[in-house]
Amino acid sequence: MARRGTEAFPDLGAQCDREDCNQLDFLPFDCDGCGKTFCAEHRTYRDHGCARAADQGRTVVVCEACGDAIERRAGDGGGDDAAVLEAHARSRRCDPARKRKPRCPVPRCKETLTFSNTSGCKGCGQKVCLKHRFPADHACAGAGAGAASKAAGAAAAARSAGQCGRDAQKKEGGGWKLPQSVRNMKIF
């Protein structure tokens, strides 16, 4: 049983159960193997030399075919990696098609497409990453329609600029042209 807290605050924290430590820790860790209380320095099975660590440890084996991580439990007989992988291969959960993640089809782009960074092109219907979402960035097959819409947009911008009287008077340098009478005025 761990000694709890101090005389002033008996419910605050606990002392480490390791014999050579006995440090008062205000956020102690309870070991799920041996049931003792330990400080942050001795919280792992290896750090406090837990006798029941083998019962509580978790190990996984990664399937080369589908990329899944299969947990190997000590209570299941333990088995070696080959037996665990063989059982996984016989199950219906092993699907080699899942291992290969979709990638952006743009040459030299190595971006993996996920739900949050995938954009579908309206011109060609290709799924590309966000860096290549514009038709000019991914050599869109429907770029002819994109070029026509760009030309239409430029024509509309030119019409709206021509309708505004102020824009017609604007100089190339960015300033406004003053009427001749104001330019000749002298200020004393």
UniProtKB/Swiss-Prot annotation:
GO molecular function: zinc ion binding
Pfam families: zf-AN1 (PF01428)
Binding residues annotated for Zn(2+) 4, in chain numbering: 121, 124, 138, 140
Residues reported in the UniProt entry to bind Zn(2+) 3: 104, 109, 129, 132
Cellular component, GO, one term: cytoplasm
Binding, Zn(2+) 1: 16, 21, 39, 42
Keyword tags: Metal-binding, Repeat, Stress response, Zinc, Zinc-finger
Induction: By cold, dehydration and salt stress.
Function: May be involved in environmental stress response.
Protein name in UniProt: Zinc finger AN1 domain-containing stress-associated protein 17
Species annotation: Oryza sativa subsp. japonica
Gene that encodes the chain: SAP17
